[in-house]
């Protein structure tokens, strides 16, 4: 037989291809490690300067503003930025140093406002790196590997999150600045290796067209390309659900179900386990059966699981199996989402659309968590058994299930390459 099934491709692809997939994923490792460290250990540091939970939440939530403002400019700019170093890597190179430097300084700031300046600078550098990094994938990989490449990327993301939470937590108890120092070293090394080891086509004569021109181009694509618009709307729903769940899951377990912090850590471990399992297998399934199709069916389990969780008012140990299964479905959706975007976006607009997709992440950060928080406050008098927290899950479920109709059209137009994987 002259073709190679995508489900076997991870075994049969030559070492050069495997190395490229894992080398690209190092960027995701660095990004995940840095943002997880910031989200987990910055609030205790800020608590030294303020007791206002609202202010601390606003500082962390400002990440969404940078996703909304930086990405639509940097994405299309990188499409036209032709240099001997390539289109994407110059932006990544500019960002990697400030990311590491800000992480290193973050725990040593003497007051709230200097800390805020460093945190905002980190968020700016983070999205300056992430947007062209996302656009680098379709530039250097064939479409037949998009599913597996995202699976490998999310395996590395899962490893980074696990190390940041477990090892970082132990280090934080010993010396509070130590997780940030570790994050600075690993983020700089991992992201730097991606820049160093990945090669993209060079060029000459880059032209800066102006920030407003790039913003206009991004939103012109949004309104003119219906398929890209469908994906971006679906991605907003996925990111909104993820942001809401990430923000309130621990409070749901501790305050809503009256359980210990130890149990909440165990639940997060079950979620991480499901995420890694999905990352291992989702890419192969997506390349074989179609990314949109796999996301479509996984969304029913993902969203349906959230809806079912809304009925829980007390803890049972069998929830661990349920949580792991739903996490596998959710991890499948999140793993394959960017691979699907890479398949449907026009080649000349990859950077711009990557910027728009990152912008939808910002919308999720700015809308998903506050909306869920407001719903919890309003539901508290009526859902007293869980202090209102159980309303979180139907909201997340509605967002996931609401995106399913958008996938029907994407299943029809997704380029199919399951029968053959080029052995380059």
What are these regions (language model features)?
Residues 2-17, 201-233, 423-424:
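Juxtamembrane intracellular "pre-TM" segments in multi-pass secondary transporters
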Residues 71-85, 278-290, 376:
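Helix-to-loop junctions at the C-terminal end of transmembrane segments
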